[in-house]
Amino acid sequence: MPETWKDIAAEILHLYPSGARLVGVAGVDAARSRRAADDLGAALTAAGQTVERAHTDDGDEDALRADVITPFRADRSDRVLVVSGPPAVLSTSARGLWNYSVWQLAGDEKPHTAASALVQLDDPDRPFRRFADFCALPASFGA
């Protein structure tokens, strides 16, 4: 398991050690978000957490709240829900749903500055964490 996911799992557990914790994983490519969320879920499981997974293809916030978030929050037991999907998962109105958020990207995709962590996934087997250093933006950002 890549150290990047272990480190992010450790960070989540340091910040939110118990209770019902919600993690959103999003990016331009929703399928890549699914893989990233699966890998993060595996790291959280390896760290001794009970993990639940959900994925949304369209990021419909109302459906996500009604069908996934509200039922999860109804039971406050110690576990982590990792939800993956398109950029809408971390939209301005949806950001408050998550205790922690991950924006995955590849190539010159633009970073999402409101995410808790940015993970570069040019090679999903070798992810690495990026930090929002706006002095070093990719060319596609217009820098």
Which residue stretches match the model-derived regions?
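C-terminal functional extensions of proteins
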Residues: 110-143
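Extreme N-terminal, non-catalytic leader segments
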Residues: 1-22
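Glycine-rich phosphate-binding P-loop
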Residues: 23-42
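ATP-dependent NMP and nucleoside kinases share a basic, alpha-helical "lid"
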Residues: 69-114
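Hydrophobic/aromatic beta-strand patches that form the interior of the parallel beta-sheet core
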Residues: 23, 52-54, 99-104, 116-120
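Structural motif
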Residues: 26-30, 56-59, 83-87, 105-106
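Conserved nucleotide-cofactor-binding alpha/beta core module
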Residues: 59-70
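Short beta-strand-centered segment that lines the nucleotide-binding/catalytic pocket of NTP-utilizing
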Residues: 41-60
